[in-house]
């Protein structure tokens, strides 16, 4: 691809899974094709699950390039969630089949990249490429949580997707900490250091 054409390519990057207590943090990078617009792109958190699931395959089909990457639970615990998120973003951009001229990152921090990058606060709502990346990252991570739910239904991961809801914390006290939990996160660390002396009875 000619350098002049590459310089016009904008890549959007976003993540999913910084706040949950378990599972990897997932990042996606998307270069949209101006000739193949996608209606309905928006911040993934503002869309219904049904809308995200409808848009994700369209993004994969119509984008000039896209990639999804992750940082593992072990990397999150070793590096901290911020640095692990930056690592996942680096991996996603590096995995693109097309090199962009500029990368737009949702938020206020940019990972170190081989191409110019700019942080855009609220970019998942204002920049279509970031919106597309947020949808891919969210749908991939949610699918991972649903797969874990099939193996470990007692945690309720299909419902809360790993976020620290009251029901999730109660399930952790009842069933203990599985190996896919982030031990560096406060609620998990607290339970490991101070296991409950008793557990609540499950409601009928």
From Swiss-Prot:
Keywords recorded for this protein, A-Z: Cytoplasm, Endonuclease, Hydrolase, Manganese, Metal-binding, Nuclease
Gene Ontology CC terms: cytoplasm; ribonuclease H2 complex
Coiled coil location: none
Disulfide bonds: none
GO biological process: DNA replication, removal of RNA primer; mismatch repair
Cofactor(s) of this protein: Mn(2+); Mg(2+)
Molecular function GO terms recorded: manganese ion binding; RNA binding; RNA-DNA hybrid ribonuclease activity
UniProt cross-references to InterPro entries, sorted A to Z: RNase_HII, RNase_HII/HIII, RNase_HII/HIII_dom, RNaseH-like_sf, RNaseH_sf
Chain sites annotated for binding a divalent metal cation: 14-15, 106
Name this polypeptide is given: Ribonuclease HII
Organism: Azoarcus sp. (strain BH72)
